[in-house]
């Protein structure tokens, strides 16, 4: 695997790009391990976790709980303030910016090699989104 030496200098969108892939892989593995194997079922369930709304809900709850370190908070702000010139048509800009923020932190943790903390983040997000899914 190629090492990204200057990951601390990457902009929020580049970090989010990496974080998106890391989180998508985590969720797919989680769903397969949970015994979900039908393609339609996999897609519908995965979307609840990897959607901008799901990620924004998770990050807001994590911030409210004081889960973020100072460094993670700084990276989250960098992701949230990143200027994206496209916003998906089914997502409002605020939600999209929070999800970019969430993904930026995951990307940063991954590139920094902080795998234990990355795992904590993804498990916490999973727990938060699952609770939201159960109550809806």
UniProtKB/Swiss-Prot annotation:
GO terms for biological process: rRNA processing. Its main location: cytoplasm. GO terms for cellular component: cytoplasm. InterPro entries: Mini3_fam (IPR008226), RNase_III_dom (IPR000999), RNase_III_sf (IPR036389). Its cofactor is Mg(2+). Belongs to the MrnC RNase family. GO terms for molecular function: ribonuclease III activity; rRNA binding. Involved in correct processing of both the 5' and 3' ends of 23S rRNA precursor. Processes 30S rRNA precursor transcript even in absence of ribonuclease 3 (Rnc); Rnc processes 30S rRNA into smaller rRNA precursors. Keywords: Cytoplasm, Endonuclease, Hydrolase, Magnesium, Nuclease, Ribosome biogenesis, RNA-binding, rRNA processing, rRNA-binding. The active site is at 20. It is found in: Cytoplasm. SMART domains: RIBOc (SM00535). Pfam families: Ribonuclease_3. It comes from the Bacteria. Homodimer. The keyword Cytoplasm applies. The keyword Hydrolase applies. This is Mini-ribonuclease 3. Its EC number is 3.1.26.-. It comes from Listeria monocytogenes serovar 1/2a (strain ATCC BAA-679 / EGD-e). It is an enzyme of class 3 (hydrolase).
């Amino acid at each position: 695997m190629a090492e990204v030496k200057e990951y601390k200098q990457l902009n929020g969108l580049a970090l989010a790009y990496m974080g998106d892939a890391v989180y998508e892989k985590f969720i797919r593995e989680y769903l397969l391990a949970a015994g979900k194997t039908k393609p339609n079922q996999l897609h519908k369930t995965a979307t609840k976790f990897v959607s901008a709304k799901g990620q924004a809900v998770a990050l807001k709850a994590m911030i409210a709980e004081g889960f973020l370190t100072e460094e993670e908070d700084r990276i989250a702000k960098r992701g949230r303030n990143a200027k994206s010139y496209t916003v998906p048509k089914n997502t409002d800009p605020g939600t999209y910016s929070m999800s970019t923020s969430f993904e930026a932190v995951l990307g940063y943790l991954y590139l920094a090699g902080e795998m234990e903390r990355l795992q904590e983040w993804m498990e916490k997000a999973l727990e938060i989104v699952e609770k939201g899914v159960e109550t809806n």
